[in-house]
Structures are given as C-alpha cells and as structure tokens.
C-alpha cells in the first residue's frame, strides 16, 4: 500500500523592522486576533488563482492552538515532533516563522503565502528547490482546523507557529494543493462565501484508497479501518 508522505518547511528568518508591532497586543490568546488569523487564512484560500472547487473553510481549533503553543515555547527554529501534532484522528501540518522583532499575525501569514511567487500551478516549485511549503499548506484544500501561537524567546527572537489539520503538503500532490475549477464546484450545497463547509471527519491511511474501495466495495473491516474517509464520507470533501 502507498502511505502518505508529508513535506515540511521552515520560514526564513526576518531581520527587517517594517510591519513590526507590540508583541503583547498580538497575542493569539485574544479572541480578536484568533479571528484575524482565521479570516486572513480564509481570505487567501478564497482568492486563489485559479479558483478552487474543493477548498474548505478554516475554523479555529483550541487543541491545534495548544499544540502550536507548545511548539512555539520550545523556542527552536525546527518543526515539533510529528506525534505532538495531532487533533483527534488527524495528523497536523505546521508552519513556523521566526523574526528578530514582533510581527502582526496578518503579516506572518502573508509572508508564508508570498511563496506563491515560486509556484507554477500543476508543476510545483519554480525554480526547482524553491521553498513553497508554507504557501501550499495555507491553500491545502482539506486542511480545515487551524490553531496558532507565538512566543517571545528573547528581545531579538520571536517565534510564530500555526498548525493545520489534517496536514497538507502530501508529497505526491504538492504541485496541486487544491482542485481548480468554479468556486465551491464540489460542494454546491455546502458553500459559504466561496469556501466549502462539508469536511470529512475521517482521514484515509493510504493514497490509493479510492482504488481499494472500488475493488472491495468497502465491505471488509480492514478497508473500513484504513480508508474511512473514502468509505464513509459521501458528499463531503475528502
């Protein structure tokens, strides 16, 4: 069977002073800034070009935020262990940003998204080897649970972390993080402002679950346990 391989990447360290803010005022513990973070992500997901027919709306998740806070508090410019990045049945992806000065959350998210300049739709990174993983995670179609946190590690070191569940950046699909087409084309009866609102509560273990399910009709317990999204999430984004 073919297991999913998740790719991770780290943001470059920023030294410039433009866009800096008071760190305490931007705490992700505050409801207003949680909304800012979610709205920024959804605005970027909604505005992708070409448009997406299967892009899910993101929502704040307190467990993902707790995990992100633990990751940020390590004050290490490295991804947290995979086993610490889970929410329920989902494995979660992670974006990390480090700066010498505090930044507004909207600026942090925009910096990740700006890797789009190195992306060619359907091809992937151009030139080859360019960092694009933060952008692709932000626009990964089925990542719909979001939690973020920050840490002041010293007077010249600030870490910002967001976790995304289920994880994006599956290596075999990195060039196509979403399905292009009319907005909400795959969710016409579950659409809010250009984003789908019908996520699947399960995650498949294997990348060839569609073929396995077609062959077995999802009649065996093994298939149901390994391919629950394909077997049970009809009329949902999987």
Swiss-Prot record:
Residues 1-19 form the signal peptide. It is found in: Secreted. Disulfide bonds join 75-153, 92-165, 148-162, 184-191, 187-196, 200-233, 209-227, 218-231. Pfam families: CAP, Crisp. The keyword Transport does not apply. GO terms for molecular function: calcium channel regulator activity; toxin activity. Residues 200-233 form the ShKT domain. One of its GO terms (cellular component) is extracellular region. PANTHER family: CYSTEINE-RICH SECRETORY PROTEIN-RELATED. This is Cysteine-rich venom protein 1. It comes from Hydrophis hardwickii (Hardwick's spine-bellied seasnake). The lineage of its organism: Eukaryota, Metazoa, Chordata, Craniata, Vertebrata.
């Amino acid at each position: 069977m073919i297991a999913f391989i998740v790719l991770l990447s780290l943001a470059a360290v920023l030294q410039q002073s433009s866009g800096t803010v008071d760190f305490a005022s931007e705490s992700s513990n505050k409801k207003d800034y949680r909304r800012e973070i979610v709205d920024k992500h959804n605005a970027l997901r909604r505005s992708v070009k070409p448009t997406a027919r299967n892009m899910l709306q993101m929502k704040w998740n307190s467990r993902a935020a707790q995990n992100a806070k633990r990751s940020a508090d390590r004050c290490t410019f490295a991804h947290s262990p995979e086993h610490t990045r889970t929410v329920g049945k989902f494995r979660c992806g992670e974006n990390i940003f480090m700066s010498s000065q505090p930044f507004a959350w909207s600026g942090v998210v925009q910096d990740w998204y700006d890797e789009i300049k190195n992306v060619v739709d359907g091809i992937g990174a151009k030139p080859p080897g360019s960092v694009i993983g933060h952008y692709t995670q932000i626009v990964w179609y089925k990542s719909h649970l979001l939690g973020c946190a920050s840490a002041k590690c010293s007077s010249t070191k600030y870490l910002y972390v967001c976790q995304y569940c289920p994880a994006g950046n599956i290596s075999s699909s990195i060039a196509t993080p979403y399905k292009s087409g009319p907005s909400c084309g795959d969710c016409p009866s579950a659409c809010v402002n250009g984003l789908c609102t019908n996520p699947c509560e399960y995650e498949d273990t294997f990348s060839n679950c569609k073929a396995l399910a077609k062959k077995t009709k999802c009649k065996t317990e093994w298939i149901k346990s390994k391919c629950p999204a394909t077997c049970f999430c009809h009329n949902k984004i999987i």
